Design a protein with these regions (language model features):
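Short, glycine-biased loop/turn motifs at secondary-structure junctions and
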Residues: 1-239
Length: 239
């Protein structure tokens, strides 16, 4: 199983898997290299730099180096330490560009990013992000949140913006136009759905409120789930 962060070591260079796909096989296919035993023994080394406890926001200098194949080329075996260091530097360069921690950002409009404890005002165009305890004010265009973890929030989704998976206590405030949420897990919530917005699969105790026929409001819950409607009682003012 390929793990974050994967790449391929060649005799003269290292290639780190772009974006969120850490499959060695897919990366080799993109480079038109057959993923065979013979090629693994001559041309390349499948490698990974793996953060402890999957804490991808920590400094890669402390991550574990892993060779993900049984056979390695002779050129690698003559100086494995050299190639490990070259791969570490390549992953560190990728991490510096694509992992953002504890930042306030006006907008992201292209590329792929993993965000930890960040606040972003807008996601635009075809940017794709993964959120962990991060906040996005508004998503527009074809912007995508691959996954939301922890208490991550998205305020508004517009146009054809997409959230792949919501976990934990993650929240989407309002969905408009043709925006979509693929899967909801844990106690994740969608506050309001408008227009032709959609939610694909719902699991656990996730909920979504459908305002498309307002003032008639539908509450979506997972199939087989239980939902209790309780009338809110306002506190009486003190005399």
């Amino acid at each position: 199983m390929c793990r974050f962060k994967s790449g391929i070591i060649f005799k003269s260079r290292c290639v780190v898997a772009p974006g969120e796909n850490d499959s060695h096989s897919d990366l080799l296919r993109e480079m038109n290299i057959e993923d065979t035993y013979t090629n693994a023994s001559r041309l390349f080394v499948r490698a990974e730099l793996v953060p402890k406890n999957n804490e991808w926001w920590t400094d890669p200098d402390g991550w574990e180096f892993v060779v993900d194949q049984d056979v390695t080329p002779d050129w690698y075996d003559t100086d494995p330490g050299k190639y490990e260091e070259e791969f570490r530097q390549a992953v560190k360069a990728w991490w510096d560009k694509h992992v953002i921690v504890d930042k306030k950002i006006d907008e992201l409009s292209s590329g792929f990013y993993r965000l930890k404890r960040c606040k972003v005002k807008k996601l635009l165009n075809d940017v794709k992000v993964y959120l962990d305890r991060s906040t996005v004010g508004e998503m527009c265009g074809r912007s995508t949140v691959g996954e939301m973890w922890g208490s991550s929030t998205v305020g508004k989704m517009r146009d054809s913006s997409t959230v792949g998976k919501m976990w934990g206590r993650s929240t989407v405030g309002k969905m408009w136009d043709s925006s979509t949420v693929g899967e909801m897990w844990g106690s994740s919530t969608v506050g309001e759905m408008w227009g032709s917005s959609t939610v694909g699969k719902m699991r656990n105790s996730s909920t979504a409120r459908d305002f498309k026929n307002y003032p008639n409001v539908k509450i979506h819950i997972p199939k087989g789930g239980k939902f209790e409607l309780v009338e809110h009682e306002e506190e009486k003012p003190c005399d």
